[in-house]
């Protein structure tokens, strides 16, 4: 199976489209297109060898904050300082995810209080899956 960190690929698609521009208006259709194009490319390239795509999704209120209260605290400050409307972006990401679950053949996995990385690590440990982070194999 091909395990994909949904939020990471979605954000990578966004930042690839906006580059270094500021005061960017979010384009939901472009973001959807870029994400699905990325998934289509990887599915076409790797499905024969590794199997089907599984989208692993982040959830709110992750368990790590119970142990590390400042987990990802710097990201909030960065988002507050950013021109990007992060609340609108997360709504778009959630809406596209719901569309994918309803209309596309991809499996979507979301676990309460877990991030995509937790899901990916668990599936790799349980199924002996080789993990390719995009830059290196683990």
What is the role of each PLM region?
Residues 1-135:
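Noncatalytic, basic helical substrate-engagement surface that gates or grips nucleic-acid strands
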Residues 138:
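Long, positively charged binding patches that form subdomain-scale interaction surfaces
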């Amino acid at each position: 199976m091909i395990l994909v960190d949904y939020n990471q690929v979605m954000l990578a698609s966004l930042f690839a489209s906006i580059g270094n521009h500021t005061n960017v208006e979010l384009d939901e259709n472009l973001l959807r297109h870029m994400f699905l194009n990325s998934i289509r490319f990887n599915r076409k390239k790797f499905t024969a060898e590794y199997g089907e795509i599984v989208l692993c999704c982040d959830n709110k209120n992750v368990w790590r904050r119970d142990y590390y209260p400042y987990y990802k605290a710097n990201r909030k400050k960065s988002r507050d300082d950013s021109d990007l409307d992060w609340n609108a972006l997360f709504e778009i990401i959630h809406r596209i995810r719901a569309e994918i679950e309803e209309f596309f053949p991809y499996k979507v996995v979301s676990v309460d209080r877990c991030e995509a990385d937790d899901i990916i690590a668990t599936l790799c440990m349980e199924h002996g899956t080789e993990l390719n982070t995009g830059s290196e194999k683990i």
